[in-house]
Amino acid sequence: MTAAVLDCFASLAMTAHDLTPDLAARFAGIALGHVTREYPHKLDQVLDGPEDLLSPRELHPIFFGSFDWHSCVHGWWLMLRLRRLFPELAAAARIEALADEMLAPAKVAGELDYLDRAYSGGFERPYGWAWLLALHAEAQRHPDRPWAEDLEPLARAFAGRFQTYLPKLTYPIRVGTHFNTAFAMILALEWAEPNDPLLADLIRDRARDYYGQDRRCQAWEPGGDEFLSSALTEALCMRRTQGDEAFRGWFAGFLPDLASRAPPSLFAPATVADRSDGKIAHLDGLNLSRAWCWRSFAPALEPELADLARKTADEHLAASLPHVAGDYMGEHWLATFAVLALEA
């Protein structure tokens, strides 16, 4: 990114935290800069023989950019979302042309082929699965383009994997990284409600099974490389899956002392010591995802708690929104979480 653009991001700590056309343009520029950038790249691959040693582009005809597969998927989600929310965006034409080229049947078939490889059952489970469903759900909101129809076979494949996986996942994965069960179910439910009612019912049931009896969460977080809040992501999952009335009763027992700003760990933005370290840089994502959670369940809370939730979200946004660009270890993915938070 240029120095001028970085200076613009640095000023965001002092501004209102809304998704503006100016911010949308900056985020679109970031995503366009990495979704087709093949290297550096971190593959999620189990080798079954030397013939499997292929380049990211050969393995993944669409999602070979953005450092890793899942970041490329949600980079596309980000671009399509910005194209829909801001149709006058200068970058909209570039997004459309690139999507027409990349989100095409032959390339989707190549992505599906990868899922048939030996040992691919755990590929991107569940984070990448959920983001692919989110991308398809967003593509469905663009009826002037064939993107949703073309992506549907891939979405159905990952929905099927969720149907197999969730019944045998005896315990939820609570760590605040890519393996987090609650986050995946939040994204998957949004796709499943209009597309797969049986999967939607399964997600609601499993959320109740996993989290329904949780009380007095201690919120021992953050871990040193987490980008999700285990506590707040679980809470948002319960709101999305159980509805506001049930959520309020559950939430009162899960975090009963919020009015006293306890647990204190949930109110303090994480400190990021080294943004060039890809794992430590996850903590900027933690601040942004916490802001998304606080803002997202604030409407279900009593007015005093809702105000506290929004204030806490603003503090977390101020801490990390200025750092969405600047180092590729964060730049290849953070804008997505900024948009989640700003749009909430």
Regions found by a protein language model. Give the residues of each.
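A cross-taxon signal for low-complexity, glycine/charged-rich
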Residues: 1-6, 13-16
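Well-ordered alpha-helical scaffold segments within catalytic/enzyme domains
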Residues: 17-19, 76-89, 130-145, 184-195, ...
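Solvent-exposed loop and edge beta-strand segments that line ligand/cofactor-binding
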Residues: 17-21, 56-73, 113-129, 168-181, ...
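Extended, well-ordered alpha-helical scaffold segments
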Residues: 20-31, 89-106, 144-165, 196-214, ...
